[in-house]
Amino acid sequence: ILESTKGSKYTVLRPTLEDFVVEMPRGAQVIYPKDLAPMCMLGDIYPGVRVFETGIGSGALSMTMLRWGAHITGFELREDFLNRAVNNVKSFLGEEALSRYEVSLGDSYEDCPEGEFDRVMLDLPEPWRVTPTAEKILVPGGLMVAYTPSITQAVQVRESMGKGWVDQRTLEVLHRT
């Protein structure tokens, strides 16, 4: 509680992750909190889970998964977006979070990350182009979540998945206040 020079008292609160995501510096369009929570729930994000994230943008999904304890390896095509995401992570979650956040410039349509992952999280204009990569890098039983703002994109992702995937779902989230 702070007191002004005129004697008024104010309670100063730390912003929540939701507050920060909505107001943070950004270059790319962000995934909003109404979608971040279901993505992390359906992606079964937990402490220690190894995630490959691509299309990092301003880092909203990254911060949410890091807050839930994930270890993230990520690709971002644009250096300005990558730098913004790293700065946003550091600003809100602190320096410690960067030890679980290995992101680099990369084109996930062309490049494949090293290693195996428990989860693949996609926020790209054409996520169906990364489905073959996801199949290669996911451990058996691994999960892929694709954020697709249009139904056309969602259909193309589903069609790209083939029969080797279990529990394919399309979910629309509506938030009313």
Which ranges hold each PLM region?
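C-terminal substrate-binding/active-site "lid" region of AdoMet-derived donor-dependent transferases
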Residues: 128-177
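Conserved class I S-adenosyl-L-methionine
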Residues: 46-57
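N-terminal auxiliary segments of SAM/dcSAM-dependent transferases
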Residues: 1-14
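Conserved S-adenosyl-L-methionine
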Residues: 67-73, 140, 165
